């Protein structure tokens, strides 16, 4: 009986212990995601896409508040409407990840800013902080844009991590008038439950593998000097009322629809939630291109009307 009890205890305690160790070692990688290089081939492909819709690209460099150099592009529409859209890519990606979205906007007369997020692509920055520093980066980008272009309107569009940054950036800077956010995370801690649950069930991340989440977040806070509770698009949309179009990919296992639903419930401003049947993580444009185009352009044309 004692032997059986020891076996049972080992079976019960080993997975949480292993999860805690894994979380401890995963934290540095979480803050230092693999960079997707901005290769000459990718730049040529992007340029071809811009030329196809009449866009004109130029380099755009911004100095962040902590001194990091953020690199990206301004892309001007052939028939500009004096509104600019900041396009934010996802984790482990770079500005190329939102080129297809930019094509839609450029055709409609929107000028677009595509920046590599800190610690991504060609931008500097010691760590990715998922909105803690990036919201200030967004403000620096807007400062530089306003100084050079005097835009009539500024909007934002983001994918995954970029969606979270766009929402947090808009909450902190009222010059960003409205946000389209596809596959956003509700909070850093809530996203860690999905990560710890192996993209199978967040319940695993909250129970059996909870030590992974605890150690990942705790060590991340220690290494980066941020408070995880302060990295929350869900809280951000409750701080300032601004229009949001939330896009949820129905088959998303990385950041399931509950994240967008929580943000929708918390949002104080005009809001709309579009659930895209069959779409995987950040693939709404690929699954329903015409509807994506219609909804995004309609939203930016009259953000406050989106209820």
Labelled PLM ranges:
Residues 4-8, 13-63:
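An N-terminal hydrophobic leader/cap segment in hydrolases
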Residues 91-104, 117:
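The serine-hydrolase catalytic nucleophile loop
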Residues 97, 128-149:
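Alpha/beta-hydrolase active-site loop
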Residues 104-124:
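Conserved alpha/beta-hydrolase
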Residues 169-226, 235-236:
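Hydrolase active-site cap/lid region
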Residues 239-241, 246-248, 252:
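Short beta-strand/loop motif that positions the catalytic acidic residue
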Residues 253-259:
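Conserved alpha/beta-hydrolase "acid-adjacent" motif
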Residues 287-307:
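Catalytic active-site module of serine/aspartate enzymes centered on a nucleophile-bearing elbow/loop
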């Amino acid at each position: 009986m004692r032997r059986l009890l020891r076996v049972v205890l080992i079976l019960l305690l080993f997975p949480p212990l292993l999860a805690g160790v894994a979380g401890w070692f995963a934290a540095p990688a979480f803050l230092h995601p693999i960079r997707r290089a901005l290769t000459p081939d990718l730049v040529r492909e992007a340029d071809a896409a811009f030329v196809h819709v009449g866009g004109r690209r130029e380099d755009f460099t911004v100095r962040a508040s902590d001194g990091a150099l953020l690199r990206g592009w301004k892309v001007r529409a052939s028939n500009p409407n004096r509104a600019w859209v900041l396009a934010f890519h996802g984790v482990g990606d770079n500005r190329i990840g939102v080129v297809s979205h930019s094509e839609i906007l450029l055709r409609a007369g929107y000028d677009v800013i595509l920046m590599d997020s800190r610690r991504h692509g060609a931008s500097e920055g010691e760590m990715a902080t998922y909105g803690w520093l990036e919201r200030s980066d967004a403000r620096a980008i807007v400062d530089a844009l306003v100084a050079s272009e005097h835009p009539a309107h500024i909007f934002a569009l983001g994918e995954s991590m970029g969606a979270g940054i766009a929402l947090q950036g808009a909450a902190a800077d009222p010059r960003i008038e409205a946000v389209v956010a596809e596959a956003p995370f509700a909070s850093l801690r809530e996203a860690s439950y999905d990560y710890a649950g192996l993209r199978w069930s967040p319940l695993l991340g909250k129970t059996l593998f909870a030590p992974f989440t605890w150690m990942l977040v705790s060590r991340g806070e220690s290494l980066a000097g941020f408070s995880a509770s302060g990295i929350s698009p869900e809280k951000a949309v409750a701080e300032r009322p601004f229009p949001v179009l939330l896009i949820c990919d129905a088959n998303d296992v990385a950041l399931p629809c509950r994240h967008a639903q929580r943000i929708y419930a918390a949002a104080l401003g005009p809001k709309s939630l579009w659930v895209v049947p069959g779409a995987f993580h950040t693939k709404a444009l690929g699954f329903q291109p015409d509807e994506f185009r219609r909804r995004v352009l309609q939203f930016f044309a009259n953000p406050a009307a989106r209820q």
